[in-house]
């Protein structure tokens, strides 16, 4: 027994020394795994307090990248690395990590990381690529270590993304998250080489972005009097809940994300999922209300009245302010889960159908065409301002707006159809990409989720271009995971 005790103590000491000893070794098996990792037999590079991070003089983006790398290393190791600008034609000193640009690298987001005993060089075609290489280097180092020296194995890493669009979605409509949490969320996207943050800002359960021309959207629409407990039980918490972002806060997020090479795409979901807006401005609904900011989850019959010109003017006014806040090429305008029930009985909507000569056919109702009218009108407005729309795959149920990019969430079928029609597509199939679903079939022992079953293995198995020809596959811009937040705890979302 005494011998066993001594062996256990010795093992414990060995494990302890591995985290607080003189040195530790980096591991290049990171997520996402680089395209090519080739190790050599040379001695490793010794990263320590004396290491300098060098970058080309007058390149402010690479300077910021160097500062990010120094900050990341400091966070995990406690080492304080200095950054240094290199004059044209000069070489970095031995023992330095040098950041640079190389136009010969084939992909604008690609990078090459070369590690030798006396130096590390990290080149990208653009500053974006260098930043992604920094993330690989960062992840190779233990997240927390007290080692005085980090050994980077000698070799070369080459990497580039398969898709130009790599997104993550955050729903702040159902539950609101403060600005500091949104920044942490963006940091997690950066860590995993994501380049797009889809910010879902409006919902039946809350309007989260300040629109100065319509102040009631946040005075009334950002707050609900109660929230259902669980998955649409008859129990409510009877607690007032809400919040919103000012335009200045939204611009702050755009800047924060941009510094990390992440584009923020805002979503204003229309013409459905608008109960929060209707609670603030009931005259924009088909019945005139009264409406309330919705305390439950689901799909609801009350949507914007497309026959009412005030509703269309409202959308155009909102978009005018949205494009002033968000400089992104794309604006997401929803288009999902908009029941036609109210439109079928609404005199104004029926009048619009007649005026615009919207006809039913064997595949579409006149009300389907009415939704297409709405989406196309907003698309024309945004196109005139140099922007393009993204819509959920329901926009395929009428005449697709001519230049629309389709986000396929109800499986992959909508994305396949859109690509076959020549539309650009972002694949977000719920059966692979909904991160708010259960990850175990034993739901009794998992935290509450709205439904579904998406284990990690299935996420990894997604092939976004399956069932498409080579030409059609060119329309698949990339993929995106979604978090439709029926939970309010930030810690669970981060997990």
Map each language-model feature to its residues.
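Acidic, contiguous N-terminal accessory segments
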Residues: 20-166, 383-396, 400, 485
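Substrate-binding cleft/loops of secretory-pathway carbohydrate-active enzymes
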Residues: 274, 341-342, 390-423, 433-445
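Aromatic-lined glycan-binding groove of carbohydrate-active enzymes
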Residues: 413-482
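Single conserved hydrophobic/aromatic residue that forms the stacking wall/gate
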Residues: 485-495
């Amino acid at each position: 027994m005494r011998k066993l005790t001594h062996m256990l103590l010795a093992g414990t000491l060995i494990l302890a020394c591995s985290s607080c000893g003189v040195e530790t070794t980096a591991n290049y098996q990171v997520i996402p795994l680089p395209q090519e990792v080739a190790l050599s037999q040379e001695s490793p590079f010794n990263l320590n307090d004396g290491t300098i991070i060098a970058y080309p003089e007058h390149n402010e983006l690479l300077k910021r990248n160097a500062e990010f790398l120094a900050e990341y290393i400091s966070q995990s190791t406690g080492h304080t690395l200095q950054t240094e600008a290199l004059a044209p034609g000069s070489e970095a000193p031995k023992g330095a990590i040098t950041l640079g640009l190389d136009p010969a690298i084939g992909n604008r987001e690609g990078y090459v990381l070369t590690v030798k005993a006396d130096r590390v060089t990290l080149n990208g075609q653009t500053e974006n690529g260098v930043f992604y290489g920094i993330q690989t280097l960062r992840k190779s180092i233990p997240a927390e270590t007290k080692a005085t020296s980090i050994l980077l194995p000698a070799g070369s890493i080459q990497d580039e993304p398969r898709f130009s669009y790599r997104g993550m979605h955050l729903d702040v409509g159902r539950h609101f998250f403060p600005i500091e949490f949104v920044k942490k969320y963006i940091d997690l996207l950066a860590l995993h080489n994501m380049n797009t943050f889809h910010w879902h800002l409006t919902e039946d359960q809350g309007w989260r972005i300040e629109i100065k021309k319509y102040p009631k959207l946040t005075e009334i629409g950002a707050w609900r009097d109660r929230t259902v407990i669980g998955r649409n039980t008859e129990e409510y918490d009877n607690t007032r809940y809400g919040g919103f972002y000012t335009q200045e806060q939204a611009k702050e997020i755009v800047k924060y994300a941009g510094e990390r090479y992440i584009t923020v795409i805002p979503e204003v979901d229309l013409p459905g999922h608008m109960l929060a807006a209707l609670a603030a401005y009931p005259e924009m609904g088909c019945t005139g209300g009264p409406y309330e900011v919705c305390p439950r989850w689901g799909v609801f019959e009350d949507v914007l009245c497309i026959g009412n010109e005030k509703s269309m003017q409202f959308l155009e006014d909102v978009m005018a302010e949205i494009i002033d806040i968000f400089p992104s090429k794309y604006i997401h305008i929803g288009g999902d889960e908009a029941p036609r029930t109210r439109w079928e009985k609404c005199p104004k909507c029926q009048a619009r159908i007649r005026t615009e000569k919207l006809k039913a056919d064997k595949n579409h109702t006149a009300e389907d065409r009415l939704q297409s009218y709405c989406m196309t009108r907003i698309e024309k407005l945004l196109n005139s301002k140099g922007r393009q729309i993204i819509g959920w795959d329901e926009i395929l149920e009428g005449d697709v707006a001519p230049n629309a990019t389709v986000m396929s969430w109800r499986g992959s079928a909508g994305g396949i159809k859109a690509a076959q029609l020549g539309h650009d597509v972002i694949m977000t199939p719920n059966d692979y990409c909904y991160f708010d679903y259960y990850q175990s079939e034993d739901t009794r022992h998992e935290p509450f989720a709205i439904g579904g079953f998406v284990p990690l293995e299935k996420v990894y198995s997604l092939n976004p271009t399956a069932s498409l020809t080579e030409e059609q596959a060119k329309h698949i811009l990339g993929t995106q995971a979604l978090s439709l937040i029926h939970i309010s705890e930030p810690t669970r979302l981060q997990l």
